[in-house]
């Protein structure tokens, strides 16, 4: 179990914010989005938060229970027409909540933009405004990085369930993994995110490697980008300016 981790991943503003992020990846009308895959991604995200021992608000667990209800009703055999109508209503109500939150968030962002424009004429400096925008952009991209790791961790869980082999426990430290990653990026300046985990089969090693990567990103030693929707995340070692 990993303790004393100083890295904090900026959380979503709430469960609806997370769901909106997941739904937005499909780039289609909210009410046309396939809901079951979204629910599965949400539940994987919640499980990964627990695995990384990151703080998780109770509202996320409440939403998780509601989503599990919808998913279970989807998987159950059709009983009556009323059952189908009730399930569809639950799904519609959820998507309506997400859509309403989307409108609220757009309005909030518009108001924030107006506030920043007005700040040009008052006390806030141009440098401060640019810094704020950079942080917001980085946080949004970091969420995609975290979700990508969630998928890797979920795949590893499935492999453990299918494998009855007992493996002796090993200890992995963030410091060791930082050293290992630095060596890798010295030899190979650019690599795929998934390549960092392709040869790792133990959950503790996966988690420790991810935490080490976050430390390198936090210290601006490594940058990352995603060229297209659902595309591969690319990691690149940053040159240290003297």
From Swiss-Prot:
Subcellular location: Cytoplasm
GO cellular component: cytoplasm
BP GO annotations: cell division; chromosome segregation; DNA replication
Any coiled-coil regions, as ranges: none
Keywords noted in UniProt: Cell cycle, Cell division, Chromosome partition, Cytoplasm
PANTHER family, A to Z: SEGREGATION AND CONDENSATION PROTEIN A
Function noted in UniProt: Participates in chromosomal partition during cell division. May act via the formation of a condensin-like complex containing Smc and ScpB that pull DNA away from mid-cell into both cell halves.
Family in the record: Belongs to the ScpA family.
Subunit structure: Component of a cohesin-like complex composed of ScpA, ScpB and the Smc homodimer, in which ScpA and ScpB bind to the head domain of Smc. The presence of the three proteins is required for the association of the complex with DNA.
Protein name (database record): Segregation and condensation protein A
Species: Lactococcus lactis subsp. cremoris (strain SK11)
The encoding gene: scpA
């Amino acid at each position: 179990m990993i303790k004393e981790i100083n890295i904090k991943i900026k959380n979503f503003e709430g469960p609806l914010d997370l769901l909106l992020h997941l739904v937005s990846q499909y780039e289609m009308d909210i009410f046309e989005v396939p809901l079951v895959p979204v629910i599965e991604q949400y539940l994987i995200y919640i499980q990964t938060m627990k695995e990384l021992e990151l703080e998780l608000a109770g509202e996320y667990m409440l939403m998780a229970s509601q989503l599990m209800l919808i998913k279970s009703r989807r998987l159950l055999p059709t009983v009556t027409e009323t059952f189908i109508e009730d399930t569809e209503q639950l799904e519609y109500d959820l998507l309506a909540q997400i859509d309403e939150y989307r409108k609220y968030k757009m309005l909030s962002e518009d108001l924030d933009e107006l506030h920043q424009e007005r700040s040009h004429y008052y006390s806030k400096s141009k440098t401060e405004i640019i810094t704020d925008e950079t942080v917001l952009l980085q946080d949004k991209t970091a969420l995609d990085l975290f979700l990508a790791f969630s998928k890797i961790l979920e795949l590893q869980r499935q492999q453990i369930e299918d494998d009855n082999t007992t493996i002796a426990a090993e200890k992995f430290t963030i410091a060791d993994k930082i050293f290992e990653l630095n060596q890798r990026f010295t030899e190979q300046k650019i690599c795929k995110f998934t390549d960092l985990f392709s040869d790792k089969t133990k959950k503790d090693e996966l988690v420790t490697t991810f935490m080490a990567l976050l430390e390198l990103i936090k210290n601006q030693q490594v940058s990352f980008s995603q060229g297209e929707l659902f595309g591969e995340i690319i990691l690149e070692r940053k040159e240290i300016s003297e």
